[in-house]
Amino acid sequence: MDLNTILIILGIIALIILVVHGLWANRREKSQYFKSANTFTRDSRLREPPAHIQSASEEKKDANTSTPTAEVSPAQRTFAFEAEKQFAHEQQAVEQAIENIKITLPKEEQPYQAKIEPDTPPTSPALTTIAEVENYANQEEGIDTHSEQLRQQLADLAQQSPSVTLAALQEEQALMESQAQQQASEDVRQDTDATFIMMYVVAPENYQFQGARLAKILDELGFLFGEHNIYHRHSDLSVNSPVLFSVANIEQPGTFDYNMHDFSTVGIALFMQLPSEGNDLMNLRMMIRAAKSIAEDLGGFVLTDQQAIFDDQAEKAYLDKVR
C-alpha cells in the first residue's frame, strides 16, 4: 500500500477518535448541569438551575433546616441560561467543524499510453510545384483550382520560393551516386597501379642479425630511421625528400627499435612502391645492390618475394617488371 494512503487512513482514524472524545466530554459536562438529557428543553433550562446550584441549595438546607425553601434568584437563572447558551454554541461549533472536514484521497495515476503516430514527412511549399499543388488539392480537398484568384496566389507562391520537383531530386541523387562510383573506381585504379617490389635478406638458420651491426650498415648505405619506425632510403639523403625504397623487420610488428643495441631479428624486408620517385629501373637496381651489401656484411642470404634464392635469373625477372 502506498505510504500516502496509510498516512491518510491513520489521520482519519485519529480525527474520528478526537471527535468521539469531544462528544463524550460534552455529554459528561452536560450531565453536570442537567438532571436528565432526554427531558432537556429550553423551558426546563430556564426553570431549573444547574446541578451544582441545586447541590449548593441542598447543602444550605441541611445546614439550616429551619430556614424555608429558597427560591431561585434571577441571578442564578441568568447564570444557568448563559451556561446552557455557551454549551449549545460549543456543540454547534463542533458539528460545524465536523461538516467542514473534507478528506480527499490521491487519485491513482493513469498508466501512460504512448501514442504511436505514423512518420509522415513534413510538407513544405518550397518542394512542390503549382501542378502538384493543384493535383493534391483536387484529390484530397476538392478545391476548385480553376479559380483565377487561386491560380494567381499559387503563381506568386512559386515565384517567392523556388520549387524543387521530385524529378529534379532524383536527377541530383543519380548524379551524386555517379560521382561516388567514379571516385571509388579511381581509388581502386590507384590501388591497383600502386604495386610493390619486395625482397628479403635473412640470417642463416639458428642465427640472428644483431641490431647494432644492422644499424651501422643501413647508415652507411644512406638509410634513415623515420616514419612507421622503419628505415627509408630517400632520393637526396634528407627526410624531407621523397622515399625511393624502405627496409622493415620481417618479425612482427615489422618495426625497429630506436635503441638498436638491444635489437635482433632473423631477417629484413626491402620493398619499393611503383611508380617510385625518378627512374624506377635505377631505383630498383639501387635496392638490389643494397640487399646484396647487407647480406654480404651480415653473412645472410637474399631471397625473392617467393622466398627463393635471389640469383641472376631472379634479378633479371625483377628488372623486367619495371622496364
From Swiss-Prot:
Residues in the Periplasmic compartment per record: 1-4
Cytoplasmic side: 26-323
Pfam families listed in its UniProt record: ZipA_C
Keywords: Cell cycle, Cell division, Cell inner membrane, Cell membrane, Membrane, Transmembrane, Transmembrane helix
InterPro entries linked: Cell_div_ZipA, ZipA_FtsZ-bd_C, ZipA_FtsZ-bd_C_sf
Region annotated Disordered, chain positions: 44-73
SUPFAM superfamilies named in the record: Cell-division protein ZipA, C-terminal domain (SSF64383)
Chief localization: membrane
Keyword Transmembrane helix: yes
Transmembrane segments: 5-25
Superkingdom of the source species: Bacteria
UniProt topology in membrane: Single-pass type I membrane protein
CDD domains tied to this protein: ZipA
One annotated GO biological process: division septum assembly
The keyword Ligase appears for this protein: no
Subcellular location: Cell inner membrane
Coiled coil: none
CC per GO annotation: cell division site; plasma membrane
HAMAP family hit by this protein: ZipA
Subunit-level organization: Interacts with FtsZ via their C-terminal domains.
Family to which this protein belongs: Belongs to the ZipA family.
Protein purpose: Essential cell division protein that stabilizes the FtsZ protofilaments by cross-linking them and that serves as a cytoplasmic membrane anchor for the Z ring. Also required for the recruitment to the septal ring of downstream cell division proteins.
PANTHER family for the chain: CELL DIVISION PROTEIN ZIPA (PTHR38685:SF1)
Protein known as: Cell division protein ZipA
Organism this protein belongs to: Pasteurella multocida (strain Pm70)
